[in-house]
């Protein structure tokens, strides 16, 4: 790991002046900080993250409305409130550009005081956030949206595995004595693809127990019974997210579901285990609402809109991240390759029709020995994201 840090010039420490500037930021939220913010502290709010996550940068809030619809809030940490333009911390963040995630560590863009504390949406702590709030029907119709600065107090920190348990059990989970912490924590370390040594399994169990103890300080308590209202929120949001996802693919999104390979290393940085991280419905739930928020904000800025009845002018300049249409030559190569296995695929120039054709090919090849190779070629035919 040290050689990677050296090869790419990754700064694993912050200069004292940057650390001092971050440490000088107050942990307390004052009335001045709350001015102009919508208050969501009494609204049911939670995060869903990997079980070993240390920084929680987004959260969902959920509230049933009297008209039968739901208010769903997508909240992210309001980093810009703490990191002011031109400050020492701002200049350092610009120089770094991004956080870099290695197998055994993270090289953060911001000092720990910000990334893991002030701007981490930890449970039972008031946090300043920027939010996209939607009124949504049970059939995922967007009635209205609002964007602005808020304050939240997360009630619960879910691991993906725990949220997935609720989804898997469906309505039965409402009557079950599901408990946070233990199952979610251990699920991620009990599904190895490859064990590099006989001792790895025992080591994984020991480390999971250590993570479990550490998580007690982050709001995930061993044996903590998950309240019914939280389970209801997860199930309702899962239903809405499923409709949003189906609608997105019908509109031309392409489904790539390659499992991510994860490597576990020991204290000396040596690999001891390789396992698959498979994306499930709990991951899709978060993904769909993040996409909804991003897309809605982009549409609002691009076309102009109304917030609280006041028309906003469309921004003349804004940064969008988009994917161009697939490379036709590479698509032709994919068609030829797939044809060797008996598949036929049209290659229309229209982007949406091409997306439908690609999804059809991937669906037809699903669970076949050649699927992985076809999916890789399909992925390579995609254009890189541009700004």
Language-model-detected regions and their locations in the chain:
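Electropositive polyanion-binding surfaces
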Residues: 2-387
